[in-house]
């Protein structure tokens, strides 16, 4: 898959950020650059400074979690159309449905396989290009 995208990985765990970056490279997702942020607050700063095409974000992080970050993104004309895939251990159907209603493009439950990751990202990127 050749997307040439700039991807922002947002998670308070450096191990998770590195694992996601490895999977991006392993599945052949052609990312121009992969940026990292430890929380939603850092992510919003990166979104202002860089041209990001896709955000992969955890929900529960210090300072600002994924839900609040999505609210801020959707309220800002510069970031409102950037797709966000939530990558979390959250399993509540109500929470997941709420995330999708509030602006997340998709949800990926941790732990996940590279194949599951590829499927979700391919669907998200494909929907964004239409």
Predicted regions span which residues?
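Active-site residues of response regulator receiver
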Residues: 58, 88
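Short amphipathic alpha-helix used as the core "switch/output" element in two-component signaling
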Residues: 45, 67-80
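C-terminal output helix
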Residues: 112-121
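Helix N-cap/capping motif at the beta->alpha junctions
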Residues: 36-45, 66
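Two-component/phosphorelay signaling modules centered on CheY-like receiver
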Residues: 14-35, 102
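Active-site beta3 strand of CheY-like receiver
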Residues: 50-56
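Alpha4 helix (beta4-alpha4-beta5 surface) of REC/receiver domains from two-component response regulators
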Residues: 68, 91-106, 119
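Receiver (REC) domain active-site loop signature in two-component systems and cognate sites
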Residues: 61
């Amino acid at each position: 898959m050749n997307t040439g995208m700039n991807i922002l990985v947002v998670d308070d765990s450096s191990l998770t950020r590195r694992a996601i970056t490895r999977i991006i490279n392993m599945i052949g997702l052609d990312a121009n650059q992969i940026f990292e942020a430890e929380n939603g607050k850092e992510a919003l700063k990166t979104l202002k400074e860089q041209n990001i095409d896709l955000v992969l974000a955890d929900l529960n992080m210090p300072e600002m979690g994924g839900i609040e970050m999505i609210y801020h993104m959707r309220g800002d004309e510069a970031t409102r159309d950037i797709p966000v895939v939530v990558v979390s251990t959250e399993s509540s159907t109500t929470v997941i449905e709420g995330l999708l209603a509030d602006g997340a493009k998709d949800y990926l439950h941790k732990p996940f396989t590279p194949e599951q990751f590829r499927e979700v990202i391919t669907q998200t990127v494909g929907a964004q290009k239409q």
